[in-house]
Amino acid sequence: MSGNTLGLLFTVTTFGESHGPAIGAVVDGCPPGMTLSEADIQADLDRRKPGTSRHVTQRKEEDKVEILSGVFEGKTTGAPIGLLIRNTDQRSQDYGDILQTFRPGHADYAYHYKYGFRDPRGGGRSSARLTAPVVAAAAIAKKWLKEHYGTEFYGYMGQLGEIEVPFQDKKHIAENPFFAANSEIIPQLEGYMDELRKAGDSCGARIEVRASNVPIGLGEPLFDKLDADIAHAMMGINAVKGVEIGAGFKSVSQRGSVHGDDLHPDGFASNNSGGTLGGISSGQELRVAIAIKPTSSIMTPKHSVDIKGQPITVQTKGRHDPCVGIRATPIAEAMLALVLMDHALRHRAQCGDVELAVPPIPASRPGSQLD
């Protein structure tokens, strides 16, 4: 099985399965000399881990990260950094009934016909459990980007099922299990999820993620554009079915006189481009949104076939997220951080000595509201 590595200079290779003894990542290309401890990584893992509210899977995993290599006396050495997260709450018996069947919407059918053999326990390699080492690896990238450029990341839920979640203030994001930047809508979201669970069904979500203080010049035309690599990474998140950069699909209904972001000596007037121009970062805030499909593992009976091609009815058991989007915010932040880290090192390698007499304009004009 290939396709387990992301990045060119800053690479992350994940390993493990949902119900194996452990999952983890090997991070290669991290510059030496950065202070790094397990505590630096754990905070983001705690934001992603399961069992944190009644609205997500009740699988209890502490997701405690162990640094196995690449750090000596509290500093990165430049060697590959090995990260390990042990699985402690597997219930593989919940998946005995699906060994010979295919769950609608899951990777079961495609994995079976690609590999001829699959691990059905919790989805095996296709499980969202494998996003934990991605988040762990990205904590390293976030730290380096913060120290060198002041880059900051935050994400939030923009929509849960049919309910749009208007942005109110990012201070609310850490105050609720939905990562919603709106405190007033939480009771409605909780009621919606309670009804969804009673119905044995699931829903999708829209997640917004932002990065500020991104240096100008990240991205490589033509086929390694920054936004192209962001989309590639975001589509690597389980259940993601769509990616938008900036105005995204709203660009279709915009006119050029509106969509083009005017430049002024005191800054950009708007940010429909989402922080990239020609696939290269403009210095503006990077704005990305992802669409996450409804969870495929539901209690509602669904039609399917078994491995012999015979018709069956599937009613999924086990512990599952009724909306995987609820825990997706730190994962989306992680993917964005990994792409930026990789491109930052690539830009530094090729264009690190480029100097211009005229400094760049500010990311936004004073007092402007960039929507």
From Swiss-Prot:
<comment type="subunit">
    <text>Homotetramer.</text>
</comment>
<keyword id="KW-0028">Amino-acid biosynthesis</keyword>
<keyword id="KW-0288">FMN</keyword>
<keyword id="KW-0274">FAD</keyword>
<dbReference type="GO" id="GO:0010181">
    <property type="term" value="F:FMN binding"/>
</dbReference>
<comment type="pathway">
    <text>Metabolic intermediate biosynthesis; chorismate biosynthesis; chorismate from D-erythrose 4-phosphate and phosphoenolpyruvate: step 7/7.</text>
</comment>
<keyword id="KW-0456">Lyase</keyword>
<feature type="binding site">
    <location>
        <begin position="238"/>
        <end position="239"/>
    </location>
    <ligand>
        <name>FMN</name>
    </ligand>
</feature>
<dbReference type="GO" id="GO:0004107">
    <property type="term" value="F:chorismate synthase activity"/>
</dbReference>
<feature type="binding site">
    <location>
        <begin position="293"/>
        <end position="297"/>
    </location>
    <ligand>
        <name>FMN</name>
    </ligand>
</feature>
<dbReference type="Pfam" id="PF01264">
    <property type="entry name" value="Chorismate_synt"/>
</dbReference>
<feature type="binding site">
    <location>
        <position position="278"/>
    </location>
    <ligand>
        <name>FMN</name>
    </ligand>
</feature>
<feature type="binding site">
    <location>
        <begin position="125"/>
        <end position="127"/>
    </location>
    <ligand>
        <name>FMN</name>
    </ligand>
</feature>
<dbReference type="GO" id="GO:0005829">
    <property type="term" value="C:cytosol"/>
</dbReference>
<protein>
    <recommendedName>
        <fullName>Chorismate synthase</fullName>
        <ecNumber>4.2.3.5</ecNumber>
    </recommendedName>
</protein>
<dbReference type="InterPro" id="IPR000453">
    <property type="entry name" value="Chorismate_synth"/>
</dbReference>
<dbReference type="InterPro" id="IPR035904">
    <property type="entry name" value="Chorismate_synth_AroC_sf"/>
</dbReference>
<dbReference type="InterPro" id="IPR020541">
    <property type="entry name" value="Chorismate_synthase_CS"/>
</dbReference>
<keyword id="KW-0285">Flavoprotein</keyword>
<feature type="binding site">
    <location>
        <position position="54"/>
    </location>
    <ligand>
        <name>NADP(+)</name>
    </ligand>
</feature>
<comment type="function">
    <text>This reaction introduces a second double bond into the aromatic ring system.</text>
</comment>
<dbReference type="GO" id="GO:0009423">
    <property type="term" value="P:chorismate biosynthetic process"/>
</dbReference>
<feature type="binding site">
    <location>
        <position position="319"/>
    </location>
    <ligand>
        <name>FMN</name>
    </ligand>
</feature>
<feature type="binding site">
    <location>
        <position position="48"/>
    </location>
    <ligand>
        <name>NADP(+)</name>
    </ligand>
</feature>
<dbReference type="GO" id="GO:0008652">
    <property type="term" value="P:amino acid biosynthetic process"/>
</dbReference>
<keyword id="KW-0521">NADP</keyword>
<dbReference type="GO" id="GO:0009073">
    <property type="term" value="P:aromatic amino acid family biosynthetic process"/>
</dbReference>
<keyword id="KW-0057">Aromatic amino acid biosynthesis</keyword>
<comment type="similarity">
    <text>Belongs to the chorismate synthase family.</text>
</comment>
